UniProtKB/Swiss-Prot annotation:
Residues annotated as domain Core-binding (CB): 79-163
Keywords: DNA integration, DNA recombination, DNA-binding, Transposable element, Viral genome integration, Virus entry into host cell
Tagged with keyword Glycoprotein: no
CDD domains: INT_ICEBs1_C_like
Originating organism: Enterococcus faecalis
The name this protein goes by in its record: Transposase from transposon Tn916
UniProt family annotation: Belongs to the 'phage' integrase family.
Active site: 225, 264, 343, 346, 369, 379 (o-(3'-phospho-dna)-tyrosine intermediate)
């Protein structure tokens, strides 16, 4: 009968257990791929003390118990050791065909993970407290609440893949960010009727910004996304039927420059009606066009709105223009305008028609929203004044019905 192996304290070691010359305990096992794997600890059991100068750790037999539980539960004991960066790369590899801006966003997040200590951690070691600490570090590094929330959502999706693949049991990113960070997101600006009138009047009269008057007016009267607006070409305008055909958007990337993309969703492909003000504004835009050399981008040319270099304008151009316009207005007027972006004009358009009682499905179509919830809950901003006006309108209708009856 073979003699039982013992450690340096005379304790019998079980099958697979051994002790190295430096005193560290070792457990050897064979993984699902037939490859030998090893687990180490300075302690055999939980009550042991670690040698002087060594960091405290989980005992070998506690680690063996966790390992055996993982194997019993079908957990991939190799897969759970992949790093967070590797897991995120695995998720992205499962959906390789994405838009360029999505690809750019993925790269940004991967770069963040590579620089953060969480990125090199094995996914089985990441706890909810670790994920929350990551969110706090992101905030301390200047990232906005909404940006952190978007990145958290991506990592949460990555861990769902790990759960489905039996690499981990729980999702450490399954928590509400607002329980960790204050939501400092600035409410989206919706212009009042008075603010809208003042903005247009100032732009029309100002020597610097009068050239942008029709652009602002069209954005307010069509509700187009700025990428759709910037991508408009002459063939997209149907003056006979008074509509704008939307089937593409123009974007610009710092690395690849200008490029054309299809709309964000299938619902983005639509025909937006031209109200009279938009119709006349488009007519003025065409009348004022110069016979400059036309650029071509991904097969599209005859862009309507060009910068000084005869390249089509994009979001950054309009953001800068609106910022300068509002700054100049506020310099000379006591009744200040709020921070306004091109997207503020889209919000204003949607809110105006929602408050006017437009059929929600019709408004959803015009806005190009993928689902009705976005139209109702995300863009349509109700105010006390609009709520009061709506109540008065309904009460007036009821009174008229009674008189007729």
């Amino acid at each position: 009968m073979s003699e039982k192996r013992r450690d340096n304290r005379g304790r019998i070691l079980k099958t697979g257990e051994s002790q190295r010359k430096d005193g560290r305990y070792l457990y050897k096992y064979i993984d699902s791929f037939g490859e030998p794997q090893f687990v180490y600890s300075w302690k055999l059991v939980a009550t042991d003390r670690v040698p002087a100068g060594k960091r405290d750790c989980i005992s070998l037999r506690e680690k063996i118990a966790e390992l055996q539980k993982d194997i019993h539960d079908g957990i991939d004991v190799v897969g759970k050791k992949m790093t967070l960066c590797q897991l995120y790369a695995k998720q992205n590899a499962q959906r390789p065909k994405v838009r360029k801006n999505t690809e750019t966003g993925r790269k940004y997040l991967m770069d963040i993970l590579k620089k953060d200590k969480l990125g090199v951690r094995s996914i089985d070691s990441i706890k909810p407290s670790d994920a929350k600490e990551w969110a706090i570090r992101m905030s301390e590094n200047g990232y906005a609440y909404q940006t952190i929330n978007n990145y958290k959502r991506s990592l949460k999706a990555s861990f769902y893949i790990a759960i489905q693949d039996d690499c981990v049991r729980k999702n450490p990113f399954d928590f509400q960010l607002k329980a960790v960070l204050d939501d400092d997101t600035v409410p989206k600006t919706v212009l009042t009727e008075e603010q809208e009138e003042k903005l247009l009047a100032f732009a029309k009269a100002d020597k610097t910004y009068s050239k942008n008057y029709d652009e602002i007016l069209i954005l307010l009267k069509t509700g187009l996304r700025i990428s759709e607006f910037g991508g408009l070409t002459l063939p997209d305008l149907d003056f006979e039927n008074r509509l704008v055909n939307i089937d593409h958007q123009l974007l610009r990337d710092t690395e690849i420059g200008y490029y054309i993309e299809t709309p964000k969703t299938k619902s983005g492909e639509r025909q937006v009606p031209m109200v009279e003000e938009a119709y006349q504004a488009f007519k003025r835009v065409l009348a004022n066009r110069k016979n400059d050399k036309r650029v071509e981008i991904d097969g599209y040319s005859d862009f309507l709105f060009l910068n000084r270099k005869n390249y089509p304008k994009v979001a950054s151009d309009y953001n800068g223009m609106m910022k300068g316009l509002v700054k100049k207005y506020n310099k000379y007027n006591e009744d200040k305008l709020p921070h306004i972006t091109p997207h503020s004009l889209r919000h204003t358009f949607c809110t105006n028609y929602a408050n006017a009682g437009m059929n929600p499905k019709a408004l959803q179509y015009i806005m190009g929203h993928a689902n009705i919830a976005m139209t109702l809950n995300y863009y349509a901003h109700a105010t006390f004044d609009s709520a009061m006006a709506e109540m008065k309108r309904l009460n007036k209708e009821k009174q008229q019905e009674r008189l007729v009856a």
